[in-house]
Amino acid sequence: MSSVAVIDYGMGNLHSIAKALQHADANAAVTVTSDPDVILASDRVVFPGVGAMRDCMAHLAERRLEQVVRRAAAEKPFLGICLGMQALLEESEENGGTRCLGLITGRVLRFPEGLTGAAGEPLKIPHMGWNRVHFSDPSHPLWAGIPAESWFYFVHSYYAAPADPADVAATSDYPTPFAAAVARGKVFAVQFHPEKSQAAGLRLLANFLRWEPWSSR
């Protein structure tokens, strides 16, 4: 039985993610926790989050979880979701500049005002709703069994901009391309919400629960 720690640092609907993980694999032992010992003893770690980056980093610091997250990402299969993906980069331009965890080189940027769609219609910020995802590396194990150009559910005003294109595992468009997923080593992270993305999201979570990055990549 695989043990999965969902990191609780005071931000995000963690129980919906835990429920989706349990639905993806009924045999997984899923725990929502802020206990460093439990996190580091788990087989897999999920790092979710919604809200402001400044609050995210402050909450991690208050709970002394910054180094725990870094260590978990280096040692075991690690899934970042939404703000949890953005926090892996070096800096966010939110709130005039906020230092992030620095596990992936690059910055987090805000969608500019005045965006328009293909027909000239104004696009709202935040980017909210279903959008198509283009796999940069369709062979990655977390995309297994998910059709190309699948739709996933997004809610965000900021997006990750990795410096190295090799770190980008998927893109989406609003209206220009942005990183919808990143991958490096044992880390895979997504901007969308798999727990809200129906069959494709549940399949991604199931793939994560089976992923063995030490043997597959």
Curated annotation (Swiss-Prot):
Biological process, per Gene Ontology: L-histidine biosynthetic process
EC number: 4.3.2.10, 3.5.1.2
Residues that span the membrane, as ranges: none
Catalyzed chemical reaction(s): 5-[(5-phospho-1-deoxy-D-ribulos-1-ylimino)methylamino]-1-(5-phospho-beta-D-ribosyl)imidazole-4-carboxamide + L-glutamine = D-erythro-1-(imidazol-4-yl)glycerol 3-phosphate + 5-amino-1-(5-phospho-beta-D-ribosyl)imidazole-4-carboxamide + L-glutamate + H(+); L-glutamine + H2O = L-glutamate + NH4(+)
Gene Ontology molecular function, alphabetical: glutaminase activity; imidazoleglycerol-phosphate synthase activity; lyase activity
Pathway(s) of this molecule: Amino-acid biosynthesis; L-histidine biosynthesis; L-histidine from 5-phospho-alpha-D-ribose 1-diphosphate: step 5/9
PANTHER family according to UniProt: IMIDAZOLE GLYCEROL PHOSPHATE SYNTHASE SUBUNIT HISH
The protein's name in its UniProt record: Imidazole glycerol phosphate synthase subunit HisH
Organism this protein belongs to: Methylococcus capsulatus (strain ATCC 33009 / NCIMB 11132 / Bath)
